[in-house]
């Protein structure tokens, strides 16, 4: 997908009007029962969400189960998704929110920029950010910074027994 051409097209239509190869990325950090239910629901939801759009073709599910979001190199499905994006197999990745994709601002920006270089946008659905939008990087930086700080606070609470 040509990002600049697509941005021009989106001035007169929505992302739902585009013919796209769409995948989703989901991640939970533990294998607790609650998180397993969450990952199952995310899987089901995104498969249905993508299938309901007649212009989109579902091309893959990338699910990292029971893996921390701090280090992307330890997330096999994330790495497979990046390789498939580079190979031109994906136009858009849908994910629940920024914290599922990356746990720090630098990784959020690094990987979304890399994906855009491959012609792939990322839609952080709950955060209402799609990297195909021209102003997305500013909003992504702000929201990623907030998410990173929340992660730091939670880590400190756990460390001191206040979680």
Annotated model-derived regions:
Residues 1-163:
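Short, structured surface patches at the beginning of a domain
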């Amino acid at each position: 997908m040509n990002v600049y051409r697509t941005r021009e097209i989106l001035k007169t239509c929505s992302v739902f009007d585009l013919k796209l190869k769409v995948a989703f990325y989901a991640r939970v950090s533990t294998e607790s029962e609650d998180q397993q239910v969450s990952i199952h629901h995310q899987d089901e939801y995104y498969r249905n969400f993508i299938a309901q759009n007649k212009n989109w073709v579902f091309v893959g599910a990338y699910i990292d189960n029971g893996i921390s979001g701090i280090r992307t190199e330890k997330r096999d499905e994330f790495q497979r998704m990046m390789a498939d994006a580079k190979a031109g197999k994906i136009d858009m990745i849908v994910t629940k929110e920024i914290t599922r994709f990356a746990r720090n601002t630098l990784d959020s920006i690094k990987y979304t920029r890399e994906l855009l270089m491959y012609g792939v946008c990322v839609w952080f659905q709950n955060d209402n950010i799609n990297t195909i939008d021209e102003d997305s990087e500013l909003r992504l930086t702000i929201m990623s910074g907030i998410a990173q700080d929340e992660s730091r606070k939670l880590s400190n609470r756990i460390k001191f027994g206040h979680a």
